[in-house]
Amino acid sequence: PMPHSRQCFVNCRSQTQVLRMAYTDWGGIDNPRVLLCVHGLTRCGRDFDTLAQALAADYRVICPDVIGRGLSDRLDDPVGYGIPTYSRNLLELLAQLGISQVDWLGTSMGGLIGMAIAAQPNNPIRRLILNDVGPEITSSSLTRIADYVGRDVSWSSLEEAMSHQRQVFAPLGDLTSTQWRQLLLPCLVQDSQGQWRTHYDPRIALSLRAIDPT
C-alpha cells in the first residue's frame, strides 16, 4: 500500500511573533529513525514526496515548510529571514516532537541550515546529507538568486504559471509531464484575486542581498 502522509503544524517563535510552521509527516510516528528533509530557498516540503514515500517503511520522514514558504506563516519583519531564524525554528520543531536525533537531508538552503546546526555543540544531527550546495557561494550567484526571488509576479492561469516555472527549472532535465506537475504544483498558490503566484514570501530575497560572501 502507498504510505500516507500527515499534514501537521507546530508553533515556533521569531523574535517578535509566534509562527505556525507546517510540515508533512510520513511513516511510523513512533519510529526512532527520523529523516528530516529541508528544502531549497523558494521551495517547500512537498519537494520530498516521492523520496518520502520510498523511505517511509524504514524511516519517519519529516518535511517542513521553512517559515515564509508553503503553508507556513510569513514573518512580519523580513529582516528575520535567514539561517539563524530557520535553524532555531527547526530545532524547535524537533524539540516539540520529542526527537533528539535525526538524519538530515538538505537541498541547497536546507543544506546550509544543516551545516549551521551541525556546527553547534550537542546538536541532533547524526548524519548530514548535502544536495546541491557546498561551503562556498559566489557573490554573483547570490545577486542572481536575489533578483529572481524578489520579484512579486503573478499569472492569470495555472498553465501560464507552470509554463514559466518550467523555464526556471529547465536545468533539472527532461522530466515527464507528471514529474513536472509533482515538482511545480505544491509550490504554486492561487491568491484571493484568482491570480497564481509562487508559494513563498518574495521578501525572503532581502536577507540574500545583505550577505557578503567574502
Regions found by a protein language model. Name each.
Residues 1-36, 57-59, 99-100:
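Alpha/beta-hydrolase fold catalytic core
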Residues 15-19, 24, 50-53, 63-105:
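Active-site loop/oxyanion-hole signature of alpha/beta-hydrolase fold enzymes
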Residues 40-50, 61:
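Serine-hydrolase catalytic-loop signature spanning alpha/beta hydrolases and amidase-signature enzymes
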Residues 42, 66-70, 135:
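Alpha/beta-hydrolase active-site loop signature
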Residues 100-139:
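Conserved hydrolase catalytic core segment
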Residues 125, 133-160:
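A catalytic-pocket lid/entrance helix-loop region that shapes and gates access to the active site
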Residues 163-214:
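Alpha/beta-hydrolase
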